[in-house]
Regions:
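Conserved beta-strand positions in the central sheet of alpha/beta enzyme cores
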Residues: 88-89, 134-135, 164, 207, ...
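N-terminal active-site wall of soluble small-molecule enzyme domains
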Residues: 57, 68, 72-128
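Glycine-rich, proline-tolerant flexible connector loops at the mouths of alpha/beta enzymes
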Residues: 84-99, 137-143, 209-217
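C-terminal helical cap(s) of enzyme catalytic domains, especially alpha/beta-barrels
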Residues: 145-146, 151-154, 249-254, 258, ...
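Conserved, mostly hydrophobic/aromatic
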Residues: 41, 125, 165, 206, ...
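Conserved anion-binding
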Residues: 47, 53-58, 130-213
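Catalytic cores of alpha/beta
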Residues: 103-106, 111-112, 117-129, 223-257
C-alpha cells in the first residue's frame, strides 16, 4: 500500500490514510450498494431544509423549504434507533453550536459535524461526540486558493481517519468547481478524479453537495454522481436534488453502488412528500445477493 507522491505525502507525517488499490483502483471490496445517509441541517438554531443556492451574506434569504418544530435531538435519536450511521450535522451560519451539541450528545459517535470547522476547534467537536469533522471553507483563502498548510494542521490535529473533506460544488464551464462560504464563492479547485486522488490519503470520506440542485427536489446531478462512482476509492456521499425513490435508484445505478446519498427536502420527516423515511431505513437494511454487508469494513 502506498500514499500519493510529492508534497502531499508529507502531510500529517504518520497520520495519512493509505489507500489499497484494487484492479480498477477501488478500495471498497465486494458488492457495493448505495446507502441512505441522514442529515440534520441547522440554521439559526433550528432544524431546517433550505434551497442551497439561496444562502447569502447580504441579508436576503435563505429560501426555506421546511422549519421543524422538533429539536435536533429528536432527529438524532431516530437515526440512532434505526442505526443510520454516517449521517451529518451541518451548521449553516452562526447560532447553531448549542443545537449541534445537542444532536451529537444524543448519539455519540454516530454523526459527523460540519460548518465552521477548523484546526482550532476540530478536537472540541470530536470531544462533543462527533465521529468525524467535515471541512470545506477553512481549506481555502478568501480568493478560493487551496491552503495546503491548513490541511496539514487538521491532519496533525485529529488524523485523517477523523476528517471528511466537503467538496460541494457548482457546475461551471470546466465541469464542477468547489464552492465555499456557504456555496457563494467559487474556488480554484475542480472536482475531478485527479483532485480526489490528491486529497483522498488525507481524509476518511468525501461529502459532495451539488449546490445548484440542492433543496430543489428536481432530481439528482447524475453526471456528477457518475464521475464520483467511476472513482470510488474511499467512501463518498452525494447530496442534492433527490426527490423520489427513483432518484435514490439513479444514484445506485449511476455510481454502481459506490456513492451514498443524502435526502433532505423531499423526505417526509422534513415536510416533503416524495420520499418516506421508513422506506429509506428499509433500503439500508437490504442485503446483496451473497448476504455481505453493504460497505464491508
Amino acid at each position: 500500500m502506498e500514499t500519493r507522491p510529492g508534497r502531499w505525502s508529507k502531510i500529517g507525517q504518520g497520520r495519512i490514510r493509505s489507500i489499497p488499490l484494487g484492479s480498477e483502483g477501488h478500495s471498497l471490496q465486494g458488492p457495493s450498494m448505495t446507502r441512505f445517509r441522514p442529515c440534520i441541517d441547522l440554521h439559526e438554531g433550528k432544524v431546517k431544509q433550505i434551497v442551497g443556492g439561496s444562502l447569502r451574506d447580504d441579508g436576503a434569504g435563505p429560501t426555506e423549504n421546511f422549519v421543524s418544530d422538533k429539536a435536533p435531538s429528536w432527529f438524532a435519536q431516530s437515526f440512532r434507533e434505526n442505526d443510520l450511521k454516517g449521517g451529518h450535522v451541518i451548521k449553516l451560519g452562526p447560532g447553531n453550536d448549542d443545537s449541534a451539541r445537542e444532536a451529537l450528545a444524543t448519539w455519540p459517535g454516530g454523526l459527523q459535524i460540519g460548518g465552521g470547522i477548523s484546526a482550532a476547534n476540530a478536537t472540541q467537536w470530536l470531544d462533543a461526540g462527533a465521529s468525524h469533522v467535515i471541512v470545506t471553507s477553512a481549506l481555502f483563502d478568501a480568493e478560493g486558493k487551496f491552503l495546503t498548510g491548513t490541511l496539514e494542521q487538521l491532519v496533525r490535529a485529529i488524523g485523517a481517519e477523523r476528517l471528511v473533506i466537503d467538496l460541494s460544488c457548482r457546475r461551471t464551464a470546466t465541469g464542477w468547481t468547489v464552492a465555499m462560504n456557504r456555496w457563494q464563492t467559487l474556488t480554484e479547485m475542480d472536482v475531478t478524479h485527479a483532485t480526489l486522488d490528491r486529497l483522498a490519503p488525507f481524509c476518511a470520506e468525501f461529502l459532495i453537495h451539488a449546490a445548484d440542485v440542492e433543496g430543489l427536489c428536481r432530481g439528482i446531478d447524475a453526471d456528477l454522481v457518475s464521475l464520483l462512482g467511476a472513482w470510488g476509492k474511499i467512501p463518498v456521499t452525494y447530496a442534492g436534488g433527490a426527490a423520489t425513490m427513483e432518484d435514490v435508484l439513479r444514484v445506485q445505478d449511476a455510481s454502481h453502488g459506490k456513492v451514498d446519498v443524502t435526502v433532505g427536502s423531499a423526505l417526509d420527516i422534513f415536510g416533503g412528500n416524495g420520499l418516506i423515511y421508513r422506506d429509506l431505513v428499509d433500503w439500508n437494511r437490504r442485503e446483496p445477493a451473497d448476504g455481505s454487508a453493504l460497505h464491508p469494513e
